[in-house]
From Swiss-Prot:
SUPFAM superfamilies for the chain: IHF-like DNA-binding proteins
Full protein name: Integration host factor subunit alpha
GO cellular component terms attached to this protein's record: cytosol
Name of the gene encoding the protein in the UniProt record: ihfA
Organism of provenance: Aeromonas hydrophila subsp. hydrophila (strain ATCC 7966 / DSM 30187 / BCRC 13018 / CCUG 14551 / JCM 1027 / KCTC 2358 / NCIMB 9240 / NCTC 8049)
Family according to the record: Belongs to the bacterial histone-like protein family.
Amino acid sequence: MALTKADIAEHLFTQLGMSKREAKDMVEAFFEEIRQALERGEQVKISGFGNFDLREKNQRPGRNPKTGEDIPISARRVVTFRPGQKLKARVENVEPNE
């Protein structure tokens, strides 16, 4: 099962006593800040969690899997995530399906 933005908003509602609307708006605002920073080309560092970085990928040769035709894969910018040490340590110590 995946954790969704709606799940996070529900946790804020139940644990912090926010209204559902406030909780939803806070979650949306949080992710919008991350989106905007990445659009500006900035790195996003969340202490104890990890870093979101932008990486430039060069054009490279590719192949259409159906036809086998050679096609170029265009250059693009991609978002990468590198988990921090604290997150890695916590995930390593969790049993599957906990």
